[in-house]
């Protein structure tokens, strides 16, 4: 059985304070952002300004309504998603906010904004190439040579994931103790490229988001393919850090916060991938407190 181990990562927050008077709702401050990032960095928070959240079907998909105003993206596009299930999930994010809207907890909304606005203007092929490139620096392919206890830990916990991926997708991966990492065969890249090509643009945005959290394409594949749970994937991605924490200790509250936050982001990204692969119809749904 795979054991699960606990990666600290930095987070940045912005500020937001803007009045709304338009029949469409854009809750993002200032001009449309153009950062060289994979996804928008959401503003921090603001006072809740709506009471009811609903979804409805429009010509381009499913829309989110805050009271009687339609939600918009940071670039002032109508916030429209491709499936009813995703619309319900996003609406739930907005409906679950209390007196204060905490944008940094609304990962599905952020991913939708990124997919709709595509701030970095990347094509499907570019998204796929970026995802495949993660194999070159995949966390579980990089191994240490010492201490022996960590060497054994990596072998016991990470090797089963690699073996599963090799068998599942019919590709060769391997691992290495070299700083250059393992040599990934061209055929492996082609197989992974072909697999990722089966996903639409929205799902690819979600895949890249999850890979960025876990620093591992292989763990992401295992998670999306239901071979791993979110908890397993997250803690396997933190294997070496957890080893060091067990040996040297840690600041408990900081460790717990980062772990829970990483789980939330990873879970949201994974859910986003699956929901973006679904399609359905809806007449009108109202979500009320």
UniProtKB/Swiss-Prot annotation:
GO CC, one annotated term: nuclear speck
Coiled coil spans: none
Tagged with keyword Membrane: yes
Full protein name: ATP synthase mitochondrial F1 complex assembly factor 2
Key words of the record: Chaperone, Membrane, Mitochondrion, Mitochondrion inner membrane, Transit peptide
Quaternary assembly: Interacts with ATP5F1B; involved in the assembly of the F1 component of the mitochondrial ATP synthase (ATPase). Interacts with FMC1.
Transit peptide, residue positions per record: 1-40
Compartment(s): Mitochondrion inner membrane
A Pfam family the protein falls into: ATP12
Role: Plays a role in the assembly of the F1 component of the mitochondrial ATP synthase (ATPase).
Protein family according to the UniProt entry: Belongs to the ATP12 family.
Membrane topology: Peripheral membrane protein
InterPro entries: ATP12_ATP_synth-F1-assembly, ATP12_ATP_synth-F1-assembly_N, ATP12_ortho_dom_sf
Annotated knockout phenotype: Essential for embryonic development since it is impossible to obtain homozygous Atpaf2 knockout mice.
Modified positions (N6-succinyllysine) in chain numbering: 133
GO biological process: mitochondrial proton-transporting ATP synthase complex assembly
Lineage: Eukaryota, Metazoa, Chordata, Craniata, Vertebrata
